[in-house]
C-alpha cells in the first residue's frame, strides 16, 4: 500500500521525527530548570563541595550547608601544697599558740577600752560644744536686746553710750574666745 502524503499534516510529521522530538524535550528541560540552575550557581560560591549537599526533587532545589565550629574549653587546675611540721616541737607550738591567743585577747580588750574612751570623749566634746553654743546664743540675745534699748533710749549721754559700746566689744571678744576653744 502506498503512503498518501496529502493525508498527513506537516505539523504531525514535525512532531514525530526524531530530531524534532529530541529538541522539544531539551527545550522543556531547560525551561523548567534554567532558573533553578542559575540560583544554584549564584548561591554555591564555595569550591569545596564536601560541605554542600544539593538536592533537586520535584522542581524544588535545596542546599544544605554544613559548617564545622571548634569550641575551646578552658580548665583550671588547683594545686594544694602540704607543709610538713615534723621538725617542730609540739609542746612549744602549743604554748606559743596559747600565749598568742592571750595576747590577742588583751589587745582586743585594750582596743575596746580605747574605743569606749574615745566615745566618751566624743560625747563630752559634743556636750561642751552644745553648752558653748548655748552660751553664745544667750550672749547674742543679750546684745540684741541691749542694743535695741540703748538706741531707743534718748536720755543717755555720750559717755554712757561709749561705755555701753565698750562692754559690747568685750562680750564679742569673749564669744570669739569661746569659738576658738571649740
From Swiss-Prot:
Residues 40-182 are annotated as: Disordered. It comes from the Eukaryota. Residues 165-182 have a biased composition (Basic and acidic residues). Residues 87-100 have a biased composition (Acidic residues). Residues 52-86, 104-134, 148-157 have a biased composition (Low complexity). This is Putative uncharacterized protein DDB_G0292330. It comes from Dictyostelium discoideum (Social amoeba).
Amino acid at each position: 500500500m502506498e503512503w498518501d502524503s496529502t493525508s498527513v499534516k506537516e505539523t504531525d510529521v514535525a512532531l514525530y521525527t526524531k530530531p524534532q522530538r529530541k529538541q522539544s524535550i531539551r527545550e522543556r528541560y531547560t525551561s523548567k530548570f534554567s532558573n533553578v540552575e542559575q540560583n544554584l550557581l549564584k548561591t554555591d560560591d564555595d569550591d569545596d563541595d564536601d560541605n554542600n549537599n544539593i538536592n533537586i526533587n520535584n522542581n524544588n532545589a535545596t542546599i544544605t550547608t554544613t559548617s564545622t565550629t571548634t569550641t575551646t574549653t578552658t580548665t583550671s587546675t588547683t594545686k594544694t601544697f602540704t607543709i610538713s611540721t615534723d621538725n617542730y616541737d609540739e609542746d612549744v607550738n602549743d604554748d606559743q599558740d596559747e600565749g598568742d591567743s592571750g595576747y590577742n585577747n588583751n589587745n582586743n580588750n585594750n582596743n575596746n577600752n580605747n574605743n569606749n574612751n574615745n566615745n566618751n570623749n566624743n560625747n563630752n566634746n559634743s556636750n561642751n560644744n552644745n553648752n558653748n553654743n548655748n552660751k553664745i546664743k544667750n550672749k547674742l540675745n543679750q546684745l540684741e536686746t541691749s542694743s535695741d534699748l540703748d538706741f531707743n533710749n534718748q536720755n543717755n549721754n555720750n559717755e554712757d553710750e561709749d561705755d555701753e559700746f565698750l562692754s559690747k566689744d568685750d562680750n564679742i571678744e569673749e564669744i570669739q574666745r569661746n569659738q576658738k576653744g571649740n
